[in-house]
Amino acid sequence: MAIGRDAATTRRAFLRAAALVGGTLAVARTTDAAGATAGATGPALLGRARRTSVLKTIVVSCQENHSFDHFVGSDARLPAGYGIPRGWQNSGVRPFHFSNRTGDGVDPNHDWVSTHRAVAGGTMRGFVANGNGRDAMGYYTAADLPYYYSLLPHATLCAEYFCGVLTETLPNRMVLYAGTSGGITDDVAPANGSLTWPCITHLLHDAGVTYANYNVHAPANYSYLCLWKGNHNDPRLNRTTARFFADCRAGTLPNVVWIERPSPFDEHPPASIRIGEALSAQLFAAIQGGPQWARGEVAILHTYDEGGGYFDHRPPRAIDAFGSGVRVPMLVLSPHARHGHVDTTYSDHGSVLKLIEHVFGLPTLASVNHAFDRSTPRSAGQGRGAAFPPRDGSAKISDLTQCFSVAV
């Protein structure tokens, strides 16, 4: 789920400001001429040469709460073992086609405890018994998601891509931006500007790589990036819907772009999936109609933050005590993507960071963040646990470069 960061715009009433506990790394901050704050990760970037890539802009589009099997597992083009298995069932309930596009109006359980019960030690047989009942086994088809399915012949579909943590939204968004949730396993959000360990914007700023977050139909400070020190009220992270379309037309999208959308545009159940899909079609068409796409400079990474309590049959690997999480869709769109390809290389949300770091010649967050326990204890509390190292330092997940037909 997506959550506005300011108290006045928080969508989930149960979210409250809470201080992040344990394992923090102070990040020095300065203020630039525009009033935006800038991070300093120390000498790690000094003397690093910017590499040259055919990609100049990476757009990260992350929606809400849909697992892979539930969303695209019915596609007949998937290789054996990656789509919904014939005869698969949970507690006697087999996957079934939803008769509507609101998932029967249900938002299945998907917190830390619920997701671990659903994964059931890697058997993936606990989605129904977890308390979600029959609705956890519903899926969609190409008829329900015509735009997304129309992209498949023109994109790489990552069929072995997992979210970051076996839990709900906040920790997974944190992995997407920082490689680690800092030990957080629930949706109780820290206060804006309170996180002091590095996230990807710090690396980008220090390397002179441009970036922006666009709040599409969303209020200011809506992005989880605003949780980090110096990012709250940063104009780079608070660009508007109108600015997005203007930048697409002008060919001025920065090097790294994030797109944030509120409900019902984020596809979070039980909102109609067609609403979010329609907005994605508009946003992607604007990018693809711009001069940067025409020059072959752009890649769009479209994924989902977590599985939302919906079934999937492929077990995640134990990268550390927190994840990976449940398998989710990931589409890689680019003039240089391997069109019509289904990639089966193991990846998770940390892979997005690895691609950004690779393309722009950045160090990993794992290499500059020395605060978190490298041993990663094999237990974690429901709300907080021992902080785990940034996932972009793991050799167990890909950097997504295999999704492109040329070296990037």
Protein language model features and the residues they cover:
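N-terminal pro-sequences and low-complexity stem/linker regions of secreted or lumenal proteins
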Residues: 2-8, 13-408
